[in-house]
Design a protein with these regions (language model features):
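Conserved short histidine dyad/triad with adjacent acidic residue
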Residues: 46-64
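Short histidine-centered beta-strand/loop micro-motifs
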Residues: 58-63, 80, 103-104
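Glycine- and acidic-residue-biased ligand/ion/polar-headgroup-sensing regions
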Residues: 63-82
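Structural motif
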Residues: 75, 100, 108-110
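Double-stranded beta-helix
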Residues: 106-149
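A short, N-terminal "cap"/entry segment at the start of jelly-roll beta-barrel domains
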Residues: 1-49, 81, 139-149
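Short acidic-glycine-tyrosine-enriched beta hairpin
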Residues: 80-101
C-alpha cells in the first residue's frame, strides 16, 4: 500500500488535470460522460465503454477497487502513479486500487473498464460514488483503514 503514495506522480497528474480545466476547449467531466461513454450491465458487473478521439487528453477519477481494462481499438499513452506505458489494441490489464490515470489518445481509441457491481446498481452517479473517490485525501483514509480492494 505504501507504493500508492507516490507524491511525484500524484502531483504530475493533479497538475495536468488542473491545467486541462483552464483550456478554452476543455470539456467538463459531467458533459464528457454524456458524449463519450456507454454503460453496460450484467448481473454483478458494470462495464463502461469510452470513445476517446485522437489528440484528446483526459484525467480520470481515483478508483477504489481493482478492475479490468480493455483497449479494443487504437493506441493510447497512460500515466498513473504506478507506471507509464503506451497501450495498443488489443490490450487487457488489471488496474490497481487507487489508480488515477492521465491518458493521451495517440489514435482514436475505444476503452472499456469492467467493475464488480454486486448490488446491480444502474444509476451512474451512484456507481461513481461506489467505485471512485474525489481526491487523494479520501483515498489515503481508505488506505489507512485497509478498505481498498
Amino acid at each position: 500500500v505504501a507504493k500508492l503514495k507516490n507524491d511525484i506522480a500524484r502531483n504530475f497528474i493533479l497538475g495536468l488535470e488542473s491545467k486541462l480545466k483552464t483550456l478554452p476547449k476543455s470539456i467538463p467531466a459531467d458533459k464528457m460522460q454524456e458524449i463519450y461513454n456507454d454503460h453496460l450491465f450484467a448481473p454483478g458487473l458494470y462495464c463502461r465503454q469510452m470513445r476517446i478521439p485522437q489528440g484528446m487528453c483526459i484525467v480520470g477519477k481515483i478508483h477504489k477497487h481493482s478492475h479490468i481494462n480493455v483497449i479494443t481499438k487504437g493506441e493510447i499513452k497512460v500515466v498513473t502513479e504506478f507506471d507509464s506505458d503506451t497501450y495498443t489494441a488489443p490490450k487487457i490489464w488489471i488496474s490497481e486500487p487507487g489508480t488515477k490515470r492521465a491518458v493521451y489518445a495517440l489514435t482514436d481509441t475505444e476503452w472499456m473498464t469492467v467493475h464488480a457491481n454486486p448490488d446491480n446498481i444502474t444509476d451512474i452517479d451512484s456507481l461513481v460514488d461506489l467505485l471512485t473517490v474525489s481526491n487523494y485525501d479520501s483515498l489515503d483514509l481508505l488506505i489507512d483503514k485497509g478498505e481498498l480492494q
